From Swiss-Prot:
May be involved in the modulation of rDNA transcription. Residues 235-291 are annotated as: Disordered. The gene is RRT5. Residues 239-257 have a biased composition (Pro residues). One of its GO terms (molecular function) is mRNA binding. Belongs to the RRT5 family. Disulfide bonds: none annotated. This is Regulator of rDNA transcription protein 5.
Length: 291
């Protein structure tokens, strides 16, 4: 059923087409020459598309417009266009065979709505981290800040626990600058006042060493991170890693072993405490007569 509808649509379209597409046109042919060639078939206008080709040499740039070897001829009605195609298709024009057909304009197929992909949402809603209801975050504190100074700052809200720590911060994300350390603190309060009102009140009225401070509700994830770091530090301090085993001392070198005869002679001398007799002289030796 669909193919039949498409064929009917195509046939209806071709009956209304009055433009003829001509290919294999000689590059030397002009629009005037082609119009004279089609004049007997009622061609109202002729168009030969060209392209502009520019070169570095001035000698070759005298005529930068180059024809594409095709043409479009407009006729008064579809009947004249079909007549021209029937009679002139395959005929020779300026030593080249021409090919003619109806020019059917290109139409893109319509895409069903089901296949259209939805555009991605550019402005996605960022997920806000969860904040604690009883803990505030103090930012950019002096490096030598003490626990007592922070307690005095939040004395109206009964501070319970205070964690002072240092962290690295990057000022700009697009430029790879080296990070700098800041001193911050997490303060757990015991008050019925909403945590947002406490932050606004302290940030507007309180000062620390003559400078205003930044106070915000603390993120739950940051509180858990700091508590885990404190727990790990306490565990490492309580159970230090075992020291490296000392290398065993080298064994003493064995005493030199004397020959058995020297040992026996030494033992005999030690027992008698006598000096060994001197070796016999040549006069004491027996004389051997010559044969």
């Amino acid at each position: 059923m669909t193919e039949q509808v498409n064929s009917d649509t195509t046939s209806d379209t071709t009956t209304t087409i009055t433009t003829v597409y001509i290919s294999n046109l000689p590059f030397t042919a002009s629009e005037r020459d082609l119009h004279a060639f089609l004049n007997n078939y009622g061609a109202s206008s002729v168009l030969i598309p060209t392209q502009t080709v520019r070169r570095f040499s001035k000698r070759h740039n005298s005529n930068p417009r180059k024809p594409l070897g095709i043409a479009f001829a407009q006729f008064a009605n579809n009947t004249l266009a079909l007549k021209a195609i029937q009679d002139l298709n395959g005929t020779v024009f300026q030593n080249q065979k021409l090919f003619l057909k109806l020019h059917v304009p290109y139409e893109a197929d319509s895409t069903p709505d089901t296949d259209v992909k939805k555009p991605k949402e550019k402005n996605k809603v960022k997920k806000t981290p969860e904040t604690a209801a009883d803990t505030v975050y103090c930012h950019d504190l002096p490096d030598d800040i003490t626990d007592s100074e922070i307690r005095e700052l939040f004395q109206l809200y009964s501070p319970q626990e205070i964690w002072i720590y240092r962290s690295k911060v990057y000022r700009r994300k697009c430029i790879p600058f080296a990070p700098h350390q800041i001193t911050a603190a997490l303060v757990t309060l015991q008050s019925e006042t909403p945590i947002g009102d406490i932050c606004d009140s302290v940030a507007k009225t309180a000062t620390l060493r003559g400078k205003s401070i930044i106070v915000k509700p603390a993120y739950v994830s940051k509180i858990q991170e700091i508590k885990q770091l404190v727990k790990d530090n306490l565990t490492n301090a309580r159970d230090p890693p075992p020291a490296a085993l000392a290398e065993p001392a080298p064994a003493p070198a064995p005493a030199p072993v004397e020959p058995a005869e020297q040992v026996q002679e030494g033992q005999d001398n030690a027992e008698t405490n006598d000096v060994p007799p001197p070796p016999a002289s040549s006069s004491d030796r027996p004389t051997v007569a010559a044969a």
